[in-house]
Amino acid sequence: PICGSAIEREEGEVAARCTGGLVCAAQRREAIRHFASRRAMDIDGLGERYIEDLIAFDYVHSIADLYKLALDDFLAMKRRAEERDGSIPEAVKAGKIATRWADNLVAAIEASKDTSLERFLFALGIPDVGEATAKTLARHFGSLDVLMHASETELTEVNDVGPIMAAHIAAFFAEPRNREAITALRKAGVHWQESAPQRKAQGPLAGQTVVLTGSLSSLTRDEAKDRLEALGAKVA
């Protein structure tokens, strides 16, 4: 890979996979888009156009760089993009610069530092780890450090984590550049409350699978899902 990270190839498969998801230039845009998405770190307002321009003008090289951005960086990025596209607004030509959008982005990035372990795990974009698996991993291990040092055998003890997924998770955390990116994120202030490991689902619906269909009158689908999972159910 162009990032220099290790590659992995499943037995019997032709395609190889780069393990440098957090730092690989070829995957950078998608990694940042996923990291900032609503169900991940929820950085409101950081859309694809801004992400493309931040990358094009070398403001970000990895997801950790998002937390180094200041108001002036966003304003300079916007000005350079307008000059590139030949679309400088008349108000800007007259010396009037709108800054509220940039203020809101800086505030959204700052607010995203206070998150949960399950959201953070999902935001990392680990291969095959969706929201449900991220939540299961967070509850099973309780701590990111414990999870990062878990063996493939220990990972397969987690509900719904098979050998292939365990190998992907282990390879992701074994890649030094991914670990460096995670360390940089934590140093930037990204944090969450860790908890005691919960090896088995608890609650009156533990061990049951619930399928949500149709429309709900008083809850959003996400709210209903969160409540059911809090009662121990697995929501399909």
Where are the language model's segments positioned?
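Cys/His-rich short segments
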Residues: 1-44
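Conserved structured core elements
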Residues: 26, 44-48, 57-60, 68, ...
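Compact, charge-rich alpha-helical regulatory domains located at protein termini
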Residues: 44, 48-85, 92-93, 153-157
